[in-house]
Curated annotation (Swiss-Prot):
GO terms for biological process: adenine catabolic process. Homodimer. Its cofactor is Mn(2+). It comes from Shigella flexneri serotype 5b (strain 8401). Transmembrane segments: none annotated. It is an enzyme of class 3 (hydrolase). Gene3D superfamilies: Metal-dependent hydrolases (3.20.20.140), Urease, subunit C, domain 1 (2.30.40.10). This is Adenine deaminase. Pfam families: Adenine_deam_C, Amidohydro_1. One of its GO terms (molecular function) is adenine deaminase activity.
Length: 588
């Protein structure tokens, strides 16, 4: 918890203080009073009866003693339960394929009043210009959009080709920006553990802010060393005992439930009354279809309550107060005097049924957000421009030669998990010894014109056709999987023609595609339109076989070398446990 930095985010003038205190004392008229409401007590459990009094952006008072306080406007909550606005502790907005403006429109009416985002997806493509655009969006947003400064661009030096660098000098230029809360996930955990000076320089430079971690499956002395370097949290835990050990060693635990990585069921049993201040909720990557049909942080709270019997005050605590404290955002996370009036009114607290949302003391109207979306997006000056330098490809670019009797490495996918296994498969004149093996390739899309890196993929469920995308963590080269070289080439050429995007090919034809004109990562369409297009893509993909629930998001992580065990980057097959490149043929 970084109380030392709270002053950076809690902007309130002396005049605002005087006005707030006057309303708190009962000597002045409030702006809003929320009547007929019960407030969920996140500290003591139970509920607090009485109105909530708001002046400007802040809560002036709470409780029955304010029943007769005059106000410019009164809101009848109709017996609703009030809770603090929800906070996502770690996400990449770009992975929703929405702009920050569209993301706000889609999630703010669901109670998501604050996000802590790492824009390293667009920074890997466009460098500092991408970070600057996110900062502009954050400055004009109603939603509290805070930024962690991207620390690993690319994710691992020397393992992939990305579009831009983000130097320490450039990072430092953003450190004191009012929307910056710290240093984003330090993914090169072997480098930190081994004391690489370039990484320690980054940690030292952001030491007084929050230092985000990334260490899937790490334990023993290595975990101790990583934490000793100053890393404060991790969102990559996927096993119960792994999460427990990190909590024991002083790390804060971000429990992630995204579109590809589903760790809530594994980690929810850890949450209790005692450790909940050290537990937070995050999505990391969640697509617009899931947001529209299931929700965002509201969906995670619902599952904690309904499926894991987490007490109400604890479930809402880890969705708000715990995260606010961790990032030094002490003006957020509680419904109490002096706190920012980010309030979610729930008609049913157990089902997380959102009735109304207020942020910074103002009621949110979903229709107004939608009506203003285009104008607000234009005001942010999005960084348009084609970032795909790759020329069209042909089937011969994906030709691989196999020798009968030889054994070859296969990236073995685990549905709805980011980690993969490494297995081997024997080739014969009739093909591989398991029929789930298909082809995967990664094509550098920026400047070096590297030949496609090709490999084998198992367990994905692709029985026919091909899928291609320019969303491919973290360097966002073109990734394609397929059963035939011809269909792989067709899918790749479609996303090149679109200037970036997603594509499904089957029966030798493009069945569905989605252009992503901003950095090959984001659409400028509305959230509703984007959700419908995602629905069409998923429907087309399902015709190709029993794929993961979110095939494109899962596919996007097959090239991320900092998550074990076997991945494919633009430079070849990478062993994520040894942190070294390996060969397609098994020769050991």
């Amino acid at each position: 918890m970084n109380n030392s930095i709270n002053h950076k985010f809690h902007h309130i003038s002396r005049a605002e203080y005087q006005e707030l205190l006057a309303v708190s004392r009962g000597d002045a008229v409030a702006d809003y009073i929320i009547d007929n409401v019960s407030i969920l007590d996140l500290i003591n459990a139970g509920e607090i009866s009485g109105p909530i009094v708001i002046k400007g952006r802040y809560i002036a008072g709470v409780g029955a003693e304010y029943a007769d306080t005059p106000a410019l406007q009164r809101i009848d909550a109709r017996g609703a339960t009030a809770v603090p606005g929800f906070i996502d502790a770690h996400l990449h907005i770009e992975s929703s394929m929405m702009t920050p403006v569209t993301f706000e429109t889609a999630t703010l009416p669901r109670g998501l009043t604050t996000v802590i985002c790492d824009p390293h997806e667009i920074v890997n493509v466009m460098g500092e210009a991408g970070f600057a655009w996110f900062a502009r969006c954050a400055e004009q947003a109603r939603q509290n959009q805070y930024l962690q400064v991207s620390s690993c661009v690319p994710a691992l030096e020397g393992c992939d080709v990305n579009g831009a660098s983000f130097t320490l000098e450039q990072m430092l230029a953003w450190r004191d920006h009012p929307q910056v809360t710290g240093l984003a996930e330090m993914m090169d955990y072997p480098g930190v553990i081994n004391g690489q000076n370039a990484l320690l320089d980054k940690l030292d430079a952001f030491r007084y802010l929050t230092l985000d971690g990334h260490c899937p499956g790490l334990g023993g002395k290595e975990l101790n060393a990583y934490i000793a370097a100053g890393i404060e949290n991790c969102h990559e835990s996927y096993q119960l005992e792994e999460g427990r050990r990190k909590l024991q060693l002083g790390m804060s635990l971000m429990i992630r439930e995204g579109s590809a990585a589903s760790n809530l069921n594994a980690l929810a049993p850890l949450i209790n009354e005692f450790n909940s201040p050290q537990c937070m909720l995050c999505t990391d990557d969640r697509n617009p279809w899931e947001i529209a049909h299931e929700g965002h942080i509201d969906a995670l709270i619902r599952r904690l309550i309904e499926q894991h019997n987490v007490p109400l005050h604890v479930a809402y605590r880890v969705a708000s107060w715990s995260t606010a404290r961790h990032f030094g955002l002490n003006h957020l996370g509680l419904l109490a005097p002096g706190k920012q009036a980010d309030i979610v009114l729930l008609s049913d607290a157990r089902k997380v049924t959102v009735q109304q949302v207020l942020v910074k003391g103002e009621p949110i109207d979903a229709q107004t957000l939608q009506a203003e979306e285009s104008a607000r997006l234009a005001l942010s000056a999005p960084p348009y421009g084609n970032t795909i330098a790759r020329q069209p490809v042909s089937a011969s670019d994906f030709a691989l030669q196999f020798t009968p009797g030889k054994r070859y490495r296969v990236i073995d996918v685990i549905h709805n998990e980011l980690i993969t296994h490494s297995r081997s498969s024997v080739y014969s004149e009739n093909g591989f010894d398991r029929d789930d093996v298909c082809f995967i390739a990664v094509l550098e899309r920026y400047r070096q014109r590297l030949a496609p890196a090709c490999g084998l993929l198992g367990g994905f469920g692709l029985n026919e056709g091909a899928l291609a995308a320019t969303v491919s963590h973290d360097s966002h080269n073109i990734v394609v999987i397929g059963r035939s070289a011809e269909e792989m080439a067709l899918a790749v050429n479609q996303v090149i023609q679109d200037g970036g995007g997603l594509c499904v090919v089957r029966n030798g034809q493009v069945q569905s595609h989605l252009p992503l004109p901003i950095a090959g990562l984001m659409s400028t369409d509305t959230a509703q339109s984007l959700a419908e297009q995602i629905d069409a893509l998923k429907a087309a993909a399902r015709e190709c076989g029993p794929l993961p629930d979110e095939p494109f998001i899962q596919m996007a992580f097959l090239s991320l070398p900092v998550i074990p065990a076997l991945k494919l980057t633009s430079q070849g097959l990478f062993d994520g446990e040894k942190f070294a490149f390996t060969t397609l043929e098994v020769t050991e």
